[in-house]
UniProtKB/Swiss-Prot annotation:
The active site is at residue 217. Keywords: ATP-binding, Kinase, Nucleotide-binding, Phosphoprotein, Transferase. ATP binds at residues 89-91. Belongs to the fructosamine kinase family. It catalyses: N(6)-D-ribulosyl-L-lysyl-[protein] + ATP = N(6)-(3-O-phospho-D-ribulosyl)-L-lysyl-[protein] + ADP + H(+); N(6)-(D-psicosyl)-L-lysyl-[protein] + ATP = N(6)-(3-O-phospho-D-psicosyl)-L-lysyl-[protein] + ADP + H(+). Its EC number is 2.7.1.172, 2.7.1.-. GO terms for cellular component: cytosol. The keyword Phosphoprotein applies. Pfam families: Fructosamin_kin (PF03881). This is Ketosamine-3-kinase. The modification Phosphoserine is found at residue 20. The keyword Phosphoprotein applies. It comes from Mus musculus (Mouse). Coiled coil: none annotated.
Length: 309
């Protein structure tokens, strides 16, 4: 591993630190190099390169906003024996505690960044000598992402769409339901989904949604802090509805009331928020069902029943 990293990173010295970490999907290890300490995530799956390229693009996109701290990605490398590795900046992280309020503020800033950019460009339209910022940060007026990103190890369809409701139904829920059908042929789930599809547009009536850059998998295990403030990592980014971000955050805990208060002071809840949050949680329950098995079936079906009434 050390020899491979020397070659790929152009380093003269690479030494494992003994610091390791990992989750349900990938494992990681830190290395000291003459160019600084790096963290290397490793996954042996054949699709790992696509997964890590999506993560690298996600980290790069968030980094460019200058809103919330993420590890700086360095390179995706083919792993010896199959699979791939993602090399990134090593950050000394601890559990999120004292910086929860700041994370709420910074996450809202991340979600508002594209909207603010659009407003600024509109204001500057027709102004002579605007400078170079417009070329650096382009306003995004559609929902999607330039590359495939993975929530867990399953790829997300990120083809650009103008309509958020169609994007979410066709490119988030439908692929998950297709996997459920293929694996189990669960007739009750399929019937509930058919009924729910007719109700979804009602949840978005009179709602204007500006595409927001999302982390995409913001559960408690993907947030942390250091002495300077909060850190988010392991993203599965795309441009979507800002409310989507809060769905998985509320499913498994790890976020204090101060986080939500700070967030909603910048992005207030709008009518229908709670039902849309359930709709967004449906994706994550289905995604967990397809990753980890039928233990998540009941939660998935309950949401579809509740929202189909």
């Amino acid at each position: 591993m050390e020899t491979l990293l020397k070659r790929e990173l152009g380093c003269s010295s690479v030494k494992a630190t003994g610091h390791s970490g990992g989750g349900c999907i990938s494992q990681g290890q830190s290395y000291d190099t003459d160019k600084g300490r790096v963290f290397v995530k490793v996954n042996s799956k054949a699709e790992a390169r696509r997964m890590f390229e999506g993560e690298m693009a996600s980290l790069t996109a968030i980094l460019k906003t200058g809103t919330v701290k993420v590890p700086k990605p360095i390179k995706v490398v083919d792993a010896p024996g199959g699979g791939s590795m993602l090399v990134m900046e090593h950050l000394d992280m601890r559990y999120l505690s004292s910086h929860a309020t700041k994370l709420g503020t910074q996450l809202a800033d991340l979600h508002l960044e594209n909207k603010r950019l659009g407003e600024r460009l509109l204001k500057e339209a027709g102004t002579v000598g605007k400078g170079g910022e417009q070329a650096e940060r382009q306003y995004v007026d559609q929902f999607g992402f330039d590359v495939v990103t993975c929530c867990g190890y399953l790829p997300q369809v990120n083809d650009w769409q103008k309509n958020w409701v169609e994007f979410y139904a066709r490119q988030r829920i439908q692929p998950q339901m297709d996997m459920v059908e293929k694996k189990s042929g669960d007739r009750e789930a399929l019937e509930l989904w058919s009924a729910l599809q007719l109700k979804i547009p009602d949840l978005f009536r009179d709602l204007e949604i500006v595409p927001a850059l999302l982390h995409g998998d913001l559960w408690g295990g993907n947030v942390a802090e250091d002495s300077s403030g909060p850190i988010i990592f392991d993203p599965a980014s795309f441009y979507g509805h800002s409310e989507y971000e809060l769905a998985i955050a509320g499913m498994f805990g790890g976020f204090s009331s101060s986080f939500y208060s700070a967030y909603h002071s910048k992005i207030p809840k709008t009518p229908g928020f709670e039902k849309r949050l359930q709709l967004y949680q449906l994706f994550h329950y289905l995604n967990h069902w397809n990753h980890f098995g039928s233990g998540y079936r009941g939660s998935s079906l309950n949401i579809m029943r509740n929202l189909s009434k």
